[in-house]
Structure formats: C-alpha cells, structure tokens
Amino acid sequence: MGSTKTLVTCFLTIILAVSLSNHNVLAIDAGIKGFDTDHCDTRCYGRDECMNYCIKAGFPKGGQCGSLCIPCGFKCCCQK
C-alpha cells in the first residue's frame, strides 16, 4: 500500500511538471507573433485596454498582449 501511494504521488508530480512546462512555452509563442517587440513597454491588463492604449499612442493597427520572456510578465505590444 505504501509503494502504491508513492507511485501515484510520483506520477502526479510528473504530470504537473509536464503541464506547467507546456503552458510556459505556449505563453511565449502566442504573445508576439507578427508584432514588433520594440513597442512592448506597458503592462498588459487585457486585450481591449491594450488595443485602446496602442491606438491612442499612434499605432493604428492596435496591439496585443505578449510576453518576451517568462519572468518579464505580459506587456502590451503595439503593432506598426
């Protein structure tokens, strides 16, 4: 019974580690495709707020939330 509990705990830990690592990769890839990363200077608090910020800042195509790196957090990236 003790070995079964240990085996289940190990299995669940592996599943958790794999799911978290995949999430981080998706967050990096999804954020900045097609956008110029030079204009990611403001924290992103939502898609609509980012779009409005970029339009007011002079980027007529708007913007999108993106992350340049995992510890950087999400920034509002404006499109030229």
Curated annotation (Swiss-Prot):
Q: What is its main location?
A: secreted
Could you tell me which cysteines form disulfide bridges?
40-78, 44-65, 50-76, 54-77
Entry keyword Disulfide bond: yes
A biological-process GO annotation: killing of cells of another organism
Return the protein name. Answer: Defensin-like protein 46
Q: Which keywords label this protein?
A: Antimicrobial, Disulfide bond, Fungicide, Plant defense, Secreted, Signal
Location within or outside the cell: Secreted
Q: Which GO terms describe its cellular component?
A: extracellular region
Membrane-spanning residues? none
Q: Which organism is it from?
A: Arabidopsis thaliana
- Into which family does the record put it? Belongs to the DEFL family.
Q: Which positions carry the signal peptide feature in this UniProt record?
A: 1-27
